[in-house]
Structure formats: C-alpha cells, structure tokens
Amino acid sequence: MQKKYVVALDQGTTSSRAIVFDHDANIVSVSQREFTQLYPNPGWVEHDPMEIWASQSSVLVEALARAGIHSDEVAAIGITNQRETTVIWEKATGKPIYNAIVWQCRRSAEICEQLKAQGLEEYVRENTGLLLDPYFSGTKIKWILDNVPNAREQADRGELLFGTIDTWLVWKLTEGKVHVTDPTNAARTLLFNIHSLTWDNKLLEALDIPLSMLPDVKPSCSVYGTTRIAGEGSEIQVAGMAGDQQAALFGQLCVEPGMAKNTYGTGCFLLMNTGTKAVRSNHGLLTTVAVGPKGEVNYALEGSVFMGGATIQWLRDELGLIRDASDTEYFASKVADTNGVYLVPAFVGLGAPYWDPNARGALFGLTRGANRNHIIRAALESIAYQSKDLLDAMIKDSGVSLKRLKVDGGAVANDFLMQFQADITDVEVLRPSVCETTALGAAFLAGLAVGFWESVIELEHKACIDKHFIPNIDAQTRVQLYAGWQDAVARTRT
C-alpha cells in the first residue's frame, strides 16, 4: 500500500496529541488528550510516566481511526516533546521508579547551589550552553537517585535507565528495544557537551550519575526503530525527533543562520539559528542545539518570556476585563494608542535578557483618561515589547541583522499583536497557514528520514504563509514607544 502520511506525536506539558500530515503537509487528523498534573509539595511538579504513555498511545490510535488510515499507509512516526522533564525506569521491567519530574519543578534548587559552590557554574555555561538551574534534567536525576529508596544502588548496578520524554516514548513504542535521544533533547539535560556532542564526564561525576543510565544520542533526522499501532498491523518506522522549541524552529524551516521564530504561548520562546557556530550570549540567552537543513546539528540562541498569553489570562481571570482572549483584538483596536499606559507583566520576575526574579508587575502612565481599552492594548503591546527585548539581545550576540520573524502559537491569530510586533521591531512578521509548527517540525524530520520528502527545498514549496505583517510606523515613533517601555521596566526593578 502507498505511504501517504506521516504522524507527529506531540507530547506537551498538559496534553498528548497525535497529528497526521499528508504529503502536502496538510493536517488530515488530530487527536488530543489531557493528563494529570501532580503537585505533591509547593514548587514541585510531577507527571505519571505511564499516564503519559497511555494518553500518547491512545491518541495515536484515535487520530488514525478518525481518518480511516491504515498502518500500511503511514511512512513514519516523528516525536516532539516537552523538554527537560525527567523519567527514570528499570531496564528489566520498564517500570518507572518515580514519577516524571517536570521541567517546571524547582525541588533541585539546592543541588544547583551545591554545584555553584563547587565552582562549576562557568564550566556548565561554557560546555552545555545552559545556566545552573533546576529547570534542566541533570539535577532532577540526582534528586531521584538520592531520594528514592534503592535507586542509587540500582543505578550503580546498571539496572536503571534515564530519559527525557522523547526517550521514554521511543522505549515504549519499540517495546524496550531502543534507548535513544537526539541532540536537541540531550542539550537540555545539563549533562551534554554541545561542542563535542557527547555526554560530559565531568558533569556526570559532579552529579554522581552513571553513564550506563544515559541513552545513545542519534541525529534528529534518522530512523530509531519500528512500532506497531496497538501491537497490530504493519510495522511503522519511528524516525525523527526534536524538543518542542527546536521542532518548531525546524517546522518553520529556520534552517539557515540568522533565521528566527517566536512561539507565542503561555510564555514566548524566541530561537535564532546560528548555523554551525555555537554563539555564547552576553545578554542572558541560552546557547542550544538546533537542526540544520540536512538534519545535521546546528546551534541556536534561545530566550524566553515568562508572561505572554498568561498576561491575557490575567486580564480575563483576575481583572475581568475580557471574557475571552480573542476579545483583546477588538478592544485594543478601539483606541489609537495606549494613552501613555505601559504594563510590565513581571508577575514572576523578568526572564531574558534581564533575569531579575525580584521584579514585580506594574502599570505605569495611568491618568484620568485611561480606560479598559488602553489597559488591554498595553497588555498586548507588552508581549511584543518583551519579544523585542529578546530579539535585540540576539542581534547583539549574533551580529546578524534580522529582516523576517516567523511566528507560531495561539496568540498569532491576533492581528493587532502581530502588526504591533512588526512595528516595534521594524521586522517583517510571517504567520504560517499551518500554525501547528511544533508537530510539523517532527513530521518533517520523520518524513525526511525515511524519504517521504526528499529535501528541505521540497518542504519550502509546501510551507504557505497566511499573512505578512509589514512594519508601518516611522522610526521616531518606534524609538519613543520603546524608550517608554524601557523606562517602565527599569522602574519595576528598583
């Protein structure tokens, strides 16, 4: 039977999805299932790895069944995943020894402080591109080994395996035959040397993690093994995987140096491909691994905004100014400007490039004439201002002058926000027709790995732009608006 489809498994923080794409990169079928969030202590976040697998395997079956697709018609399954989340299981039984510790979890902060006290902060920055933070997997692994009964002894005997979610899914799909990750996920563990592209023995020793626990690192665009849907039908190749933000970068076909994408979700994630050069940031950005045009390792600069769509949720849930996120465009467009109002949504501090955990949110410029529309508009503009902060930092670090910014995520449906993003950055903003770019990136990697598609050049002909947003304000206005934002940010930090 002819191979007509590629399936992307998109394993996220709150839900598991399966999306079926045809040869023209159109979405044929989608299935999604949420799973339980566990908060056993303040600042702790966990998932049940078996529930993740159950949700992911069930949506795979559902997505194919809904479209009447037989396993014979599927060329490959690709994977993209929430990054950093940590699973440890028994090699012999496949049984997790503890819940998955989620990327958001802060329980290993003390371990990070111990590593800093050992003078490892600069070594980590130089060799992994990351900061010493509980966000990343390495300290989560150590916490499990130190706190779960018998875990340390089992690890020393070579009986335990570690994986981020991509590794866990491949292990389950291949029925325990394959223990593998890719460079984009390995680069988020705090254990991977992004220059030699190998596990770092010094960091493994510092965290007392046996090398035997770690997966093999295979290219993001390659075949890892085979699976059967619900144990039945023809074997399907499991091929191609990347962490969610790198998958989105590839899904947007940002495969050349200087190409960048911004994902507008609860927060914002801005990544710029820097090619074969790992650029070290002097502005608080992370250096990470990306995927090049032939599936090879490229590098990227990454910055994140803590409060993107979450700012709009605040307007709705806490202030009651809107009923639905989509209302913001209507209200913001009813006024010509914010009437001098700036909202700095530093509700949990400020991320890159400021990294100020003590900053707090504030509204500035309120006068008697300020109304709901001005505040809503200021909230939308704050998302664009924070993204400009990141973009300016990337341009300074990379020395590349950006001309176009590709965008994805839920908030890109807001035309006002996208136009203001173009205006304040003086960069053309491109919104794709298919905004499921994370899943699309996994599908592209899988399809390229098995020859379903021949090259990135072929994929470029399938990538359709829904709308171009062209900068439409003069330079003086842009400078004045941004100066007002910078002043507001400075005042939240004093």
Swiss-Prot record:
ATP binds at T13, T14, S15, T266, G309, Q313, G410. ADP binds at T13, R17, T266, G309, G410, N414. InterPro entries: ATPase_NBD (IPR043129), Carb_kinase_FGGY (IPR000577), Carb_kinase_FGGY_CS (IPR018483), FGGY_C (IPR018485), FGGY_N (IPR018484), Glycerol_kin (IPR005999). The keyword Glycoprotein does not apply. SUPFAM superfamilies: Actin-like ATPase domain. GO terms for cellular component: cytosol. One of its GO terms (molecular function) is ATP binding. Pathway: Polyol metabolism; glycerol degradation via glycerol kinase pathway; sn-glycerol 3-phosphate from glycerol: step 1/1. Sn-glycerol 3-phosphate binds at T13, R83, E84, Y135, D244. CDD domains: FGGY_EcGK_like (cd07786). It is an enzyme of class 2 (transferase). Inhibited by fructose 1,6-bisphosphate (FBP). It holds the Pfam family FGGY_N. Its EC number is 2.7.1.30. It catalyses: glycerol + ATP = sn-glycerol 3-phosphate + ADP + H(+). Keywords: ATP-binding, Glycerol metabolism, Kinase, Nucleotide-binding, Transferase. Glycerol binds at R83, E84, Y135, D244, Q245. One of its GO terms (biological process) is glycerol metabolic process. The keyword Nucleotide-binding applies. Key enzyme in the regulation of glycerol uptake and metabolism. Catalyzes the phosphorylation of glycerol to yield sn-glycerol 3-phosphate. Belongs to the FGGY kinase family. This is Glycerol kinase. It comes from Shewanella sp. (strain W3-18-1).
